[in-house]
Structures are given as C-alpha cells and as structure tokens.
C-alpha cells in the first residue's frame, strides 16, 4: 500500500467521500450503515471517562498547589464565558443583518411537529437544579457509567486533591494512574484504526436519510451559519490565537486528522482524547490540558452558541414573530445559561434550542420543525467550531500560566515535531507509547 494511504488523514477523507456517494446513490443502504458510525462513537466514548479521570488526577496532584488549580480553572471559566457570549452576539448580529427567514410567512400551526417530540420532551424534563444535581454522581463508580463529562471531572478533581494530601502513598497511587492512562491511550490507538469505517457509515447514513436535496433546502440559513462559523474561527479565534503567540491556520493544520473525525461523526467529543494528546505533545502542560479541555466541552461550545442564536432568530423571522431589542436581550440572557449545558455530542444543540425556546416563550417551539431536516448538516459546523474553540482556549489559558513551551509549540505547529502516537505508526506495534510521568518518586 502506498505510504500516503496509510495516513489516517487520507483514509478519513476517502471514507467521507465514499460515504456521500453511497448515501446519494443507494439511500436505503446508506441508512442501514448508521450502526458503523454509532459503534465508532460508542467506542470513543468508552475511553473518554478514564482518560479524563487519569489526566485530571495526574495534573491536579502534580500541581501540589490548590491555588494554582483554582487559578487555572477560574481563568478558563472567564475565557469560556467571554468568548461564548461573543459567539452568541455574533450569531444574533448576522441574523439581524441577513434575515434569511424573512418572507417565509410560515404559520406554526401548519407545521408537522411529530419529529420534535423527543427533543422537546428531553428539554422539558430538565430544570436548572436538575443540571446542577447531574454534576454530582450517585456514587464514585456511577460517574464513569453515566456518559457525562462533568461528574467525571468532579470526581477526578476530588481524587487529585486527596492524593496531594496523602504524601508518599499518594505518589504510589499516582504512578499507577499514570500507567493506567498509558494503557488507555494504547486502546485508543486500536480504536482509531476504525475511524475511516465510522466516518464512512455516519456520512452514508446522513446523506441516505436526508438526501442531497436537504443540503440545498433552506440553503440561505445553512450558508449564513457556515459563513458565520468561518468568520468566528478565522477572525475572532484567529485574533485571540495571534495575541497568544500562535497561528490559527497552523493550529488547524496540526489537528486536521481530528477535525476530519469530527466532520465524519458530527461529534466534537469523538476526537477529545486525541486533542488532549496533541496539545500535550505541542508543549502545553498536562495539568492545564486536563482541566481546560474537559471543562470546555460543557462550557465552551462556540459553534453551538452561534447556532442557537441564529436558529432562534430564523424561526422568529420565518413565523413573523416580532422580536425587539428587549426580547432579543432576554433571549441572549437565557442562552447564556442554556448554552452551557449542551454536550459536544450529536443532537445536543437541537435539544438545547428546544429548552431555550420553551424558556423564552416569545418564539414558537413548533417552528423548530422548519430546521429539523437540515439540523444534521449544520451539526458538522457546530462540532468543528466547538472543537477548534476548545483547542484555542487550552493554549490561551496555558500561555497565560506560562504553562506552554512556546518553542515546542512552534515546532509542532510548523510540522517539525509531530506526535509519534498515531494509530498507524510502527512504534505502537513495538510497544512504545506515552511516557509514564515518574517525576514523583515511588517509595
């Protein structure tokens, strides 16, 4: 096999193209391939919890200073709030300028809302206190079985703080956790070999079920959304990255394989473990990566923020629902809360939109039926923007803490120092992997 075809990057591109062709030419067969994408995403989710746990525990325990943990977490949350609020405002401004829904004159009473039931029910079942209580698991073990990131993060933080107090015994336990992390990353390498198959199945299902026509229907909204995401990435995040001393273009090139996985699965969560690995390799301290990335997947979803304001205003415009400045500010205030509860998984943005419209009351929830058919295609842009946003956030916070080796970052982004833990690299077969952190002695 030519060397170029051994690259995961090339394999995923080929898989996505083949998936589109199969879905377009054989729709029923394409729909039947959905389990391929589901299996890959489930396999990735299987290792996310142990990776986050081991990384956060190791990072917190090695910091030794609880004030530094609080400082890093505080900086991350402030960054998340400022940038995601900016994303919400940008989406709102674009919709007020372009007004893609104006002139549709849709009567909400005539819309078929049968397909919305599962989303509105899921949104209506959760209150603010329910979201808070979800962070606290019933048991230490249940944090790893519920499929949520925040409970794992909470347990990992507590575990890391506890190890800081245990002294030599904590050192021994920490060595074992670092070894566990290495084992899980080897497992991740096995799973990533299936990435092209997962991307193929997910893309074939999407095109097969919704058809290529759904790519062009309501195209003005889709075009506006994709354009807004691109502007946000290359202008807003680009300026932030430049201020922090790195190039957004080089960063995107550095994480291109992960971006293709996100594109194929429509889930930014599917590439979370590899993002953490690559940011560490690029020179960001493990402790900062372990805190910022998992937290960002709940609090720093820039693409979802843009989508929520644009979708809400599109529905209002299409149904001739007048929204003055006061109503739009009210919508923005609600979105500042609801957007923080959206996970980086497929469909979560639509559920969050249902919760937002239900809470605001001005915009008819039935109008969501207008975008149900194209939501799956907008999901790709949401996931990609979320993913890039979290990569930028981690490096910015690390830079503010002097917790990133800028020379190493420059070499990595220039392609001079690439990770050697790709799933198709021979070193994996020789048993080489991530180095166990043994900076704390085992006695």
Curated annotation (Swiss-Prot):
Organism of provenance: Deinococcus radiodurans (strain ATCC 13939 / DSM 20539 / JCM 16871 / CCUG 27074 / LMG 4051 / NBRC 15346 / NCIMB 9279 / VKM B-1422 / R1)
Biased composition (Basic and acidic residues): 427-443
A biological process term (GO) from this entry: L-aspartate transmembrane transport
Functional description taken from the UniProt entry: Responsible for the transport of dicarboxylates such as succinate, fumarate, and malate across the membrane.
GO CC annotations, alphabetized: plasma membrane
Family: Belongs to the dicarboxylate/amino acid:cation symporter (DAACS) (TC 2.A.23) family.
Entry keyword annotation includes Membrane: yes
Membrane topology reported for the UniProt record: Multi-pass membrane protein
PROSITE patterns according to UniProt: NA_DICARBOXYL_SYMP_1 (PS00713), NA_DICARBOXYL_SYMP_2 (PS00714)
Protein keywords: Cell membrane, Membrane, Symport, Transmembrane, Transmembrane helix, Transport
Cited InterPro entries: C4_dicarb_transport (IPR023954), Na-dicarboxylate_symporter (IPR001991), Na-dicarboxylate_symporter_CS (IPR018107), Na:dicarbo_symporter_sf (IPR036458)
Main location group: membrane
Region (Disordered): 415-443
Subcellular location: Cell membrane
GO molecular function ontology, one term from the record: succinate transmembrane transporter activity
Domain of life: Bacteria
Descriptive protein name: C4-dicarboxylate transport protein
Ranges annotated as spanning the membrane: 7-26, 46-63, 76-98, 140-162, 183-205, 218-240, 350-372
């Amino acid at each position: 096999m030519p060397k170029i075809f051994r690259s995961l990057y090339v394999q995923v591109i080929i898989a996505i193209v083949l998936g589109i062709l199969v879905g377009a030419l054989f729709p029923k067969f394409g729909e039947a391939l959905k389990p391929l994408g589901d299996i890959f995403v489930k396999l990735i989710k299987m290792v996310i919890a142990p990776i986050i746990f081991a990384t956060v525990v190791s990072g917190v325990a090695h910091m030794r200073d609880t004030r530094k943990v609080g400082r890093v977490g505080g900086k991350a949350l402030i960054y998340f709030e400022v940038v995601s609020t900016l994303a919400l405002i940008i989406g709102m401004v674009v919709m007020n300028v372009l007004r893609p829904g104006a002139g549709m004159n849709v009567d909400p009473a005539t819309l078929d809302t049968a397909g919305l039931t599962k989303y509105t029910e899921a949104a209506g079942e959760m209150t603010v206190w329910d979201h808070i209580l979800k962070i606290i698991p019933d048991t230490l073990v249940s944090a790893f079985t519920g499929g949520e990131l925040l409970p794992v993060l909470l347990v990992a933080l507590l575990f890391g703080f506890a190890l800081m107090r245990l002294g030599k015994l904590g050192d021994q336990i920490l060595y074992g956790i670092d070894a566990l992390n290495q084992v899980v990353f080897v497992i991740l390498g096995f799973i990533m070999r299936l990435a092209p198959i997962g991307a193929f199945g997910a893309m074939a299902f999407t095109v097969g079920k919704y058809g290529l026509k759904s790519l062009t229907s309501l195209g003005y909204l889709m075009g506006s959304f994709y354009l807004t995401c691109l502007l946000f990435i290359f202008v807003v995040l680009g300026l932030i990255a430049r201020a922090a001393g790195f190039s957004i273009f080089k960063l995107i090139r550095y994480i291109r394989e992960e971006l293709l996985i996100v594109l194929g699965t429509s889930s930014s969560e599917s590439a979370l473990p590899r993002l953490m690995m690559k940011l560490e390799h690029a020179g960001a301290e493990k402790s900062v990566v372990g805190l910022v990335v998992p937290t960002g997947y709940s609090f720093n979803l820039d693409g979802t923020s843009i989508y929520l304001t644009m979708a809400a205003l599109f529905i209002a415009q299409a149904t001739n629902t007048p929204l003055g400045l006061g109503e739009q500010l009210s919508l923005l205030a609600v979105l500042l809360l609801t957007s923080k509860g959206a996970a980086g998984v497929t469909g979560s943005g639509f559920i969050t939109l249902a919760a937002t419209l239900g809470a605001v009351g001005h915009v008819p929830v039935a109008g969501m039926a207008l975008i149900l058919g194209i939501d799956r295609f907008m999901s790709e842009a949401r996931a990609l923007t979320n993913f890039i946003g979290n990569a930028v956030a981690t490096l910015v916070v690390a830079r503010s803490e002097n917790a990133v080796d800028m020379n190493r970052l420059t070499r990595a982004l220039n392609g001079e120092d690439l990770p050697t833990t790709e799933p198709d690299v021979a070193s994996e077969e020789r048993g080489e992997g991530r180095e166990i952190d043994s900076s704390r002695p085992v006695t």
